[in-house]
């Protein structure tokens, strides 16, 4: 009889250990999912901030367009905010005048338009998002700027 009690005790301890390991594994999975959801939320918030900053840059473009730039390369490392950036409520943006073109996308061929690049960066440093748009403004300036190109820049770009 004593021997059976020892086996039952051992079996109960093994089952308790297995249940404890199962609970620890479930807790770890729940923590990982919580972290993933937090990162996703932060990324979406940063994307919203970058979109709002892009609109702020477009508004600045309508009121005070920049002069023609000499070296119109896109910012090399926009995630690091190196160079001249203008602050807005949701992030930072940079305006560049790319020059005049007669062959802008989605515009009547032959119409003179001035092309501008707006690069927008969200304020969140951990989940920073960078958006870049090219706008065309007709030479007659009777229309608002028209977005002709858009891209999201990743950290690897």
Stretches found by the model and what they are:
Residues 2-157:
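Terminal alpha-helical segments
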């Amino acid at each position: 009889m004593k021997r059976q009690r020892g086996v039952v005790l051992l079996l109960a301890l093994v089952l308790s250990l297995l249940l404890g390991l199962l609970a620890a594994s479930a807790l770890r999975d729940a923590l990982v999912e919580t972290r993933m959801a937090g990162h996703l939320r932060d990324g979406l918030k940063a994307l919203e901030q970058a979109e709002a900053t892009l609109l702020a840059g477009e508004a600045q473009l309508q009121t005070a367009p920049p002069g023609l730039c000499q070296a119109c390369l896109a910012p090399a490392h926009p995630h690091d905010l190196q160079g001249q950036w203008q602050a807005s409520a949701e992030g930072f943006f940079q305006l560049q005048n790319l020059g005049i073109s007669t062959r802008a996308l989605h515009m009547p061929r032959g119409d003179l338009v001035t092309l501008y690049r707006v690069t927008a960066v969200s304020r969140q440093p951990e989940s920073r998002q960078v958006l870049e748009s090219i706008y065309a403004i007709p030479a007659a300036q009777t229309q608002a700027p028209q977005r002709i190109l858009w891209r999201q820049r990743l950290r690897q770009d």
